[in-house]
Amino acid sequence: MFYWLIELSNTFPGFGAFRTFLNVFRYITFRTGGAVVTGALFVFLFGPWIIDHLRIRQGKGQPIRTDGPQSHLAKKGTPTMGGLMILSGLTVGTVLWANPLNPYVWIVLAVTLGFGFVGFYDDYLKVTKQTTTGFGSKLRLLIEAAIALVACYALVRLNRDPASTALTIPFLKDTVLHFGWFFVVFGAFVIVGAGNAVNLTDGLDGLAIVPVMIATASFAMIAYLAGNAVFADYLQIKYVAGTGELAVLCGALLGAGLGFLWFNAPPASIFMGDTGSLALGGMLGAIAVAVKHEIVLAVIGGLFVLEAVSVIVQVVSFKLTGKRIFRMAPIHHHFEQLGWTEPQIVIRFWIISVMLALAGLSTLKLR
């Protein structure tokens, strides 16, 4: 919305006196900063009202697994669906500060809200039925896959460059794997995988939101560089015109995430729920596909990959041998069973996320 101010200054001569000031709205960096502040302020201002409303409507709050760590039973009654706070702040910040004519913004936002709706319905069933399982995992994955496939098809159609359906290999200069139209399926796998990996990570207060913000900040930088022809040429990365605007969307999420963390810090006043975790993971996946840095997402989001792999390994091992590799999965629960306190796990996982983000960003230069 604010992006139109510079257009008004060109259309109506009366705005000419303010043209120097309004010119700052041309800059993605300025609008990204504005989106950060807007997202944070929205959640700070409306967060308490949303939490009170959800607490009243949900009554008993999110069900707690009885087979999990006993310390989690103290969290009984905490409302869930906190992702609504994040998605609201994200949407407001994006609508106000992003270029409304940029298709990449709307595609990624559609994936985010679509995954958020799937997570919301899952949370709704858990709360109303007071069970730790929502609707069937197969149906949920099918809906997520449908959303992701449509989004990836749209992304490929936007960029007719043959490289748009190729996979770039980090660290290796000019090395790509050409997938053709199969890239649509691969991209959908990345988006769905990212959504569910973040969902599995969201098991402790503050555990998921900070790594998500770290990954988002990293991809804000990548999107800005990939969307700038000069920087992309200098770094020898794929130039994707228009994707720089995704930095504004990332900024809105950073601000909304900071606001949510205020209320999610231990002891949490609200849980993100599937509403937030699926949406944020799906958003990261969609941005990675849009800017052609899918493998880099696996590095920067390595913590999410670790959580997802721990569940897969646990399930496969138990089905094949009847034995479990970890005391409990996802892996953050394994460390709880080993005696680590919740703050120890959360902060150490944050540190790992920072190191992985630095490793992922290093791929931009090391080629």
Curated annotation (Swiss-Prot):
EC class: transferase
Gene Ontology cellular-component annotations: plasma membrane
InterPro entries the record matches: Glycosyl_transferase_4 (IPR000715), PNAcMuramoyl-5peptid_Trfase (IPR003524), PNAcMuramoyl-5peptid_Trfase_CS (IPR018480)
GO molecular function, one term: phospho-N-acetylmuramoyl-pentapeptide-transferase activity
Presence of the UniProt keyword Lipid metabolism in the record: no
GO biological process: cell division; cell wall macromolecule biosynthetic process; cell wall organization; peptidoglycan biosynthetic process; regulation of cell shape
Reactions catalysed: UDP-N-acetyl-alpha-D-muramoyl-L-alanyl-gamma-D-glutamyl-meso-2,6-diaminopimeloyl-D-alanyl-D-alanine + di-trans,octa-cis-undecaprenyl phosphate = di-trans,octa-cis-undecaprenyl diphospho-N-acetyl-alpha-D-muramoyl-L-alanyl-D-glutamyl-meso-2,6-diaminopimeloyl-D-alanyl-D-alanine + UMP
Pathway this chain belongs to: Cell wall biogenesis; peptidoglycan biosynthesis
EC number: 2.7.8.13
Entry keyword set: Cell cycle, Cell division, Cell inner membrane, Cell membrane, Cell shape, Cell wall biogenesis/degradation, Magnesium, Membrane, Metal-binding, Peptidoglycan synthesis, Transferase, Transmembrane, Transmembrane helix
Matching Pfam families: Glycos_transf_4, MraY_sig1
Transmembrane segments: 34-54, 78-98, 101-121, 135-155, 175-195, 206-226, 246-266, 270-290, 295-315, 344-364
Subcellular localization, as worded in the UniProt entry: Cell inner membrane
Required co-factors: Mg(2+)
Domain of life of the native organism: Bacteria
Membrane topology recorded in Swiss-Prot or TrEMBL: Multi-pass membrane protein
Entry's family note: Belongs to the glycosyltransferase 4 family. MraY subfamily.
Described purpose of this protein according to its UniProt entry: Catalyzes the initial step of the lipid cycle reactions in the biosynthesis of the cell wall peptidoglycan: transfers peptidoglycan precursor phospho-MurNAc-pentapeptide from UDP-MurNAc-pentapeptide onto the lipid carrier undecaprenyl phosphate, yielding undecaprenyl-pyrophosphoryl-MurNAc-pentapeptide, known as lipid I.
This protein's name: Phospho-N-acetylmuramoyl-pentapeptide-transferase
